[in-house]
Amino acid sequence: MAEQRENFEIDLPNVELQDYETLHEFAKAAKTKLDQNSWDYLFGAAYTETTCRRNRQALDSTAFRPRVLRNVEHVDASAQFLGQKLRLPVVLAPIGSMQDFDVEAGAGPTKAAAEFGCLHMLSSVCAPGLEAVAAAAPNHPKIFQLYVRGDANFVDDHVKRALDNGYIAFAFTVDLDYYSKRERDLAKRYVTTGRRLAGYNEDHQMRFSWDDVKRVQDKFDIPIILKGIATAEDAHACVENGIDVIYVSNHGGRQLDHGRGGLDVLSEVVTAADGKAKVMLDGGIMRGADLVKAMALGADAVGMGRFQGMAIAAGGAPALVRALELLEDEVRAALGMLGVTSYAE
């Protein structure tokens, strides 16, 4: 992310939020409002940050093959995902410690998702809790993501509460058996509020297995998402175990160092899924062209984390709505310049 941070630091005029026209303006506002600890938490990654850089490199090294002289007057950037018609195939990815970026914490992205027309996946280590976030946008569908920090009763309690509060899917993060060293944070002895509140006893996550997933599937009627899939082999296992959504993710480069970039993994996972499970992808997705590349390679939706955090830090839910509007403009333009009017083409 170092290259991106340097590119964000350009001279920009001071304008009102509703007049923002570029991602750089959100970055400038966010960096002004966040302290250095929170900025580094948002844009930092594990150890050498190689996986994080590879996320961006995978996107940047994938080039388009545009077609011309086609009627692209009516471009449709919407999509269906988890039974929902979305204005963009975007899931605001789970971020712990959103309360470090904005006073509304997890409620802000949910409100923005409801106003814009996409989905928010709430992290279990994000205030103010799943009930309060559900109440912030009671008529809009949302997803809950869990870090397994307790036994079967702990898991069941969260699934039941999610169901009782109208969440339409339940995600398990499966790439956090061990907590990585995020050296930007460690060097400053910085601990996020989410980590302080939740505690990080990893024993239960280390033992969490396919048997535990099956137990939840057998007991509850809710679509299951596994977040943190990075190989065809695990994607095959997802299909064999009836997983509804395979979430290709390397935790934004914040867990295993020297992993592959997300987009580099996508094609093999889509092939392994073989249409029997939906596939979503996160990892470095910041621009409309990034989203279009993921959809062209078979994703059903993308997760956006740092994009979301940066916009929220810049100005709360209204800023995130504006950022999503600009993203939609970029997606529509990219599709049109490619000579297509939908992702299916």
Please report, for each region that a protein language model flagged, where it lies by residue.
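Generic secondary-structure signature for well-ordered alpha-helical cores
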Residues: 47, 57-64, 138, 164-168, ...
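Alpha/beta enzyme core
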Residues: 97, 110-111, 135-139, 150-281, ...
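Short, conserved beta-strand segments within well-ordered enzyme catalytic domains
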Residues: 63, 78-80, 89-93, 119-123, ...
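A gly/proline- and charged-residue-enriched helix-loop-helix capping module
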Residues: 114-136, 140-155
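Glycine-rich active-site/cofactor-binding loop and its immediate structural neighborhood
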Residues: 86-130
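Conserved active-site-proximal phosphate/metal-binding subdomains
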Residues: 1-39, 179-186, 253-278, 285-345
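Conserved active-site and cofactor/substrate-binding residues in soluble primary-metabolism enzymes
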Residues: 21, 46, 50-54, 108, ...
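An N-cap/entry alpha-helix motif that binds or orients negatively charged groups
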Residues: 2-86, 182, 191-208, 345
